[in-house]
Amino acid sequence: MEQNTDNVFNFSAGPAALPKPVMQQAQQELLNWQGLGTSVMEISHRSKEFIAVAEQSEQDLRDLLNIPDNYKVLFCQGGARAQFAAVPLNLLGDATTATYIDAGYWAESAVEEAKKYCQPDVFVAKAEKDGKQAVLPASEWQIHPDAAYVHFCPNETIDGIEINDLPVTDKPIVADMSSTILSREIDVSKYGVIYAGAQKNIGPSGIAIAIVRDDLLGLAKEVLPSILNYKVLAEQDSMFNTPPTFAWYLSGLVFKWLKAQGGVKAIEQVNREKAAILYNYIDESDFYINNVHPDNRSLMNVPFQMVKPELDAKFLKEAEALGLKSLKGHRVVGGMRASIYNAMPIEGVKALVDFMRQFEQENA
């Protein structure tokens, strides 16, 4: 039996929910885009029509994040994992090390890839505070004096841990913002490189964004594949080869949708309200638990467990039947996880809390 999509809320960590108006527009335009009689998926990436899409999407992203002129915006392939290799190969220059801040799974994944190209200096920032998971403040991070850059992941999706501050350093700061980009205001000028896989707050999977400061172009090692070379991509307007045009087009629609919501400042307020609704209920409950200290709780990914973990399967089955999708926690930590990215409306979070309250009453 088909579910009414009006009552379905997708809490997937990624690929994540896309704004419904974006999907509706893509559906309407799918077979005949801009009166061309063909789909946007079928036209040349070199055509004037698609060049206009590419240029407008870049400008919209620049507007949303207030990206300074001395930064290049690159639309890349291979997702964030490709950037785990691209970052050291583009930025090391003659250096043999870079500092990596380890606060969770994705930071550790970046370290493992970097080991192929250098000897990463790893600072473990994981901590415990009041019996909860936390992260050491950036002022306590130890940065190697010879580091080519400092890499960190501001939001660890699996544990639901967020880093909210930056170190004071003369080293370029590199951030994997796959799960936080466009969810709150940031000062791009404080970073050397920001990269993000698209499939959470930007668009569908298949594309990634890299925002690179101009002075960091041209440091690439000779062995770096051209498709990962920031300078090559910048010189070729991200079209060194055929890009994932449909994902690029959809990302552009998401940027326009976000501007129509009032931009990043407005969506940040909504995101904070959504997270507060969910965390407040969990904290008030004796049935649900979140193991992250409030100082480091993620705005985007809210993991929670029940005091009766044997009820997990029942919880997930009943939630699914009500249209509350993809709430199963990551296999590493178990339990449940609600990913509440930009496209998740407040109504979805309220529907989840209503279900959680009812489930608690029936099963406590």
Curated annotation (Swiss-Prot):
InterPro entries: Aminotrans_V_dom, Aminotrans_V_PyrdxlP_BS, Pser_aminoTfrase, PyrdxlP-dep_Trfase, PyrdxlP-dep_Trfase_major, PyrdxlP-dep_Trfase_small
Location(s), subcellular: Cytoplasm
Single Gene Ontology MF annotation: pyridoxal phosphate binding
Gene Ontology biological process: L-serine biosynthetic process; pyridoxine biosynthetic process
Cofactor(s) in the UniProt record: pyridoxal 5'-phosphate
Cofactor binding, note field: Binds 1 pyridoxal phosphate per subunit.
Residues holding pyridoxal 5'-phosphate: 80-81, 106, 157, 176, 199, 241-242
EC class name: transferase
Gene Ontology cellular component annotations, sorted alphabetically: cytoplasm
Modified residues (N6-(pyridoxal phosphate)lysine): 200
Catalyzed reaction equations: O-phospho-L-serine + 2-oxoglutarate = 3-phosphooxypyruvate + L-glutamate; 4-(phosphooxy)-L-threonine + 2-oxoglutarate = (R)-3-hydroxy-2-oxo-4-phosphooxybutanoate + L-glutamate
Functional pathway: Amino-acid biosynthesis; L-serine biosynthesis; L-serine from 3-phospho-D-glycerate: step 2/3; Cofactor biosynthesis; pyridoxine 5'-phosphate biosynthesis; pyridoxine 5'-phosphate from D-erythrose 4-phosphate: step 3/5
Primary location: cytoplasm
Highest taxon in the source lineage: Bacteria
Keywords (A to Z) from UniProt: Amino-acid biosynthesis, Aminotransferase, Cytoplasm, Pyridoxal phosphate, Pyridoxine biosynthesis, Serine biosynthesis, Transferase
EC number, UniProt record: 2.6.1.52
Pfam families per UniProt: Aminotran_5 (PF00266)
Residue numbers binding L-glutamate: 46
Function as written in the Swiss-Prot or TrEMBL entry: Catalyzes the reversible conversion of 3-phosphohydroxypyruvate to phosphoserine and of 3-hydroxy-2-oxo-4-phosphonooxybutanoate to phosphohydroxythreonine.
Similarity comment text for this entry: Belongs to the class-V pyridoxal-phosphate-dependent aminotransferase family. SerC subfamily.
PANTHER family registered for this protein in UniProt: PHOSPHOSERINE AMINOTRANSFERASE
Subunit structure: Homodimer.
UniProt protein name: Phosphoserine aminotransferase
